[in-house]
């Protein structure tokens, strides 16, 4: 079974502190997720991010099918990076690293996502036509939303 990778970088004209304050609040995930995803946090977003935090969502990632998604924040280094891992949800594996690096005039935000699909060979067949384009669309939406909120470099 194949493990896929999605890698994205974005520069924003804000401080590392501002970027961290926004990203470390789980409630802001709804802000940067397309409305059609039906994203709603069910539990676990009442505090800023910490290692061991469990966050439960309802999300409609593909074909209008509602999914319960549970992630754990497994690693946090204040104002540098955090990792979220799916504990229950639509993927066989979901390991998402978020990095923040100070650069001249702002920050570089980097996402490194490793994921595996369920359903073996059928999942692999669906990847290039359904899953990969949807994930790329979601990450592009996030990129545009962050520019709308914070400006561009």
Region annotations inferred by a language model:
Residues 5-7, 66-70, 93-96:
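Short, surface-exposed coil-to-beta transition loops
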Residues 1-50:
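Hydrophobic ligand-binding cavity/cleft-lining segments
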Residues 86-137:
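Beta-strand/loop substructures that line and gate deep hydrophobic ligand-binding cavities in soluble
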Residues 7-13, 40, 58, 72, ...:
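Generic structural detector for well-ordered beta-strands
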Residues 41-88, 141-144, 148-153:
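Glycine-rich portal/gate segments that line the openings of hydrophobic small-molecule binding cavities
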Residues 15-16, 74-81, 99-108:
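A short, structured loop/turn motif at beta-sheet edges
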Residues 12-14, 61-63, 75, 90, ...:
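Beta-strand elements of well-folded, non-transmembrane domains
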């Amino acid at each position: 079974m194949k493990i896929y990778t999605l890698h994205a970088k974005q520069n924003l004209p804000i401080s590392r502190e501002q970027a961290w304050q926004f990203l470390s609040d789980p409630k802001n995930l709804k802000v940067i997720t397309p409305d059609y995803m039906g994203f709603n946090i069910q539990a676990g977003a009442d505090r800023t991010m910490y290692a061991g935090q469990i966050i439960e969502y309802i999300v409609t990632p593909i074909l209008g099918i509602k999914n319960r998604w549970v992630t754990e924040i497994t690693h946090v280094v204040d104002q540098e990076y955090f990792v979220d891992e799916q504990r229950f949800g639509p993927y066989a594996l979901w390991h998402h690293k978020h990095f923040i690096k100070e650069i001249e005039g702002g920050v570089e935000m980097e996402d490194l996502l490793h994921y595996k699909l369920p359903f073996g060979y059928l999942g692999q067949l669906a990847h290039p036509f359904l899953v990969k384009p949807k994930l790329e669309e979601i990450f592009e939406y996030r990129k545009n939303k962050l520019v709308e909120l914070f400006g561009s470099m």
